[in-house]
Curated annotation (Swiss-Prot):
This is Gamma-aminobutyric acid receptor subunit beta-2. Keywords: Cell membrane, Chloride, Chloride channel, Cytoplasmic vesicle, Disease variant, Disulfide bond, Epilepsy, Glycoprotein, Ion channel, Ion transport, Ligand-gated ion channel, Membrane, Phosphoprotein, Postsynaptic cell membrane, Receptor, Signal, Synapse, Transmembrane, Transmembrane helix, Transport. The gene is GABRB2. GO terms for biological process: cellular response to histamine; chemical synaptic transmission; chloride transmembrane transport; cochlea development; gamma-aminobutyric acid signaling pathway; inhibitory synapse assembly; inner ear receptor cell development; innervation. It holds the Pfam family Neur_chan_memb. One of its GO terms (cellular component) is GABA-A receptor complex. It is found in: Postsynaptic cell membrane; Cell membrane; Cytoplasmic vesicle membrane. Heteropentamer, formed by a combination of alpha (GABRA1-6), beta (GABRB1-3), gamma (GABRG1-3), delta (GABRD), epsilon (GABRE), rho (GABRR1-3), pi (GABRP) and theta (GABRQ) chains, each subunit exhibiting distinct physiological and pharmacological properties. Interacts with UBQLN1. May interact with KIF21B. Identified in a complex of 720 kDa composed of LHFPL4, NLGN2, GABRA1, GABRB2, GABRG2 and GABRB3. Residues 26-241, 293-310, 512 are extracellular. The modification Phosphotyrosine is found at Y441. The chain crosses the membrane at residues 242-262, 273-292, 311-331, 491-511.
């Protein structure tokens, strides 16, 4: 009994296989090729490709499948990506149903020109083409119930609007929009054939700069002025790989910034070395910025990598300005400070000499139309014996209020008491004539006194020359270098600490 039931089950399950084998053999049999030809001719005879299936009835449902072969390129400059795929559409056309042959008929690609096909197009397409090697890559397959499978091998360049504010730590969403060009939702409907399994090959894609994190399928309807149209969307979520940019941009920028700090350890008086190092690092950062801008579109907002490169550029530029500050203190502010101190001391000495000079009486004498002011001893007790008198004069000119206008020059003059008595007693003796430039000592015209006048003038000239030498030495006197060294020492700590803080804030903000 059990054997009989077993044989019965075997007969039930094997009957369809036998029928299919017989039909297949009949189809492949050259004697039955005429039957296949007659079936195809009958289907195409009287077929009107101008009318959609079920014209005037319910909308035809078109299911779609995509098998992605590769994503060839993602361009930030052109804001697009290139995709190669096997695009398949399936719909049912009752006019193409048959029951004579219980098998699918795969026909030549040229038959597609004689059948109705959906007017599908890619909404965000920039440039597309159907491959034609060795023949046009199209497929038409008919099923007995009238289902038509239409396949194409297409390469399309689709627009992908990117937000590059976080570049190169960004994630982008690139979509492929599929829509009917002429038929509205009253005539045609689109759906993903196989639901979530409608798109395959995504996990096999490998991109040099991106990783496909996720993808999703979207079905929606869009409304235009001409009606409502069906639309299918395939959205890729792309995450940029940071490894290339770390090696190409970030690491060189970090190393160049650190290199600019080497100038803090170079001696402050080595101007050529520090300036050359600073300018070289600044120009290198400028070159990196320029190269980066050439590989990106001209967008109005600031990108993440722009923030980093600008930060590095600021640090490099500030290192150069640090030496400018050191150089200013070393060669500029120090001598100026010393000069001001010297002028202040000279002013104090002038004020002191002004008070001392007020103790000397002046006597105005007019001789030969010229007015002189004579110095004389108010005591008049100069003894005839030889004595040494030291006078501290000021090499000065005086205004009507007797204010001292020039710096102090100490003049020590040793003369005989007899000459001093003669000079102070005679109103025509040694006198000072004031003009706008200097002091002139004049004698009373006696030949015997000309030697003393010339000696005094020579002494004054020597003092003037000595004062000029002291003034020239003041300009090259090396100032106190404590502040200069302190700036370099603080810079060695300040720059690395601030740059490290900048990196921590940058990476925490943009990575998260």
């Amino acid at each position: 009994m059990w054997r009989v039931r077993k044989r019965g089950y075997f007969g039930i399950w094997s009957f369809p296989l036998i029928i299919a084998a017989v039909c297949a053999q009949s189809v492949n049999d050259p004697s039955n090729m005429s039957l296949v030809k007659e079936t195809v001719d009958r289907l195409l005879k009287g077929y009107d490709i101008r009318l959609r299936p079920d014209f005037g009835g319910p909308p035809v449902a078109v299911g779609m499948n995509i098998d992605i072969a590769s994503i060839d390129m993602v361009s930030e400059v052109n804001m697009d990506y290139t995709l190669t795929m096997y695009f398949q559409q399936a719909w049912r056309d009752k006019r193409l149903s048959y029951n004579v042959i219980p098998l699918n008929l795969t026909l030549d690609n040229r038959v597609a020109d004689q059948l109705w096909v959906p007017d599908t197009y890619f909404l965000n397409d920039k440039k597309s083409f159907v491959h034609g090697v060795t023949v046009k890559n199209r497929m038409i397959r008919l099923h007995p119930d009238g289902t038509v499978l239409y396949g194409l091998r297409i390469t399309t360049t689709a627009a992908c609007m990117m937000d590059l504010r976080r570049y190169p730590l960004d994630e982008q969403n690139c979509t492929l929009e599929i829509e009917s060009y002429g038929y509205t939702t009253d005539d045609i409907e689109f759906y993903w054939r196989g639901d979530d399994n409608a798109v395959t090959g995504v996990t096999k894609i490998e991109l040099p700069q991106f990783s496909i994190v996720d993808y999703k399928l979207i079905t929606k309807k869009v409304v235009f002025s001409t009606g409502s149209y069906p639309r299918l969307s395939l959205s890729f979520k792309l995450k940029r790989n940071i490894g290339y940019f770390i090696l190409q941009t970030y690491m060189p920028s970090i190393l160049i910034t650190i290199l600019s700090w080497v100038s803090f350890w170079i001696n402050y008086d080595a101007s050529a070395a520090r300036v050359a190092l600073g300018i070289t690092t600044v120009l290198t950062m400028t070159t990196i910025n320029t190269h980066l801008r050439e590989t990106l579109p001209k967008i109005p907002y600031v990108k993440a990598i722009d923030m980093y490169l600008m930060g590095c550029f600021v640090f490099v530029f500030m290192a150069l300005l640090e030496y400018a500050l050191v150089n200013y203190i070393f060669f500029g502010r120090g001598p100026q400070r010393q000069k001001k101190a010297a002028e202040k001391a000279a002013s104090a000495n002038n004020e002191k000499m002004r008070l001392d000079v007020n103790k000397i009486f002046y006597k105005d004498i007019k001789q030969n139309g010229t007015q002189y002011r004579s110095l004389w001893d108010p005591t008049g007790n100069l003894s005839p014996t030889r004595r040494t008198t030291n006078y501290d004069f000021s090499l000065y000119t005086m205004d009507p209020h007797e204010n001292i206008l020039l710096s102090t020059l100490e003049i020590k003059n040793e003369m005989a008491t007899s000459e001093a008595v003669m000079g102070l007693g005679d109103p025509r003796s040694t006198m000072l004539a004031y003009d706008a430039s200097s002091i002139q000592y004049r004698k009373a015209g006696l030949p015997r006194h000309s030697f003393g006048r010339n000696a005094l003038e020579r002494h004054v000239a020597q003092k003037k020359s000595r004062l000029r030498r002291r003034a020239s030495q003041l300009k090259i006197t090396i100032p106190d270098l404590t502040d200069v060294n302190a700036i370099d020492r603080w810079s060695r700590i300040f720059f690395p600490v601030v740059f490290s803080f900048f990196n921590i804030v940058y990476w925490l903000y943009y990575v998260n």
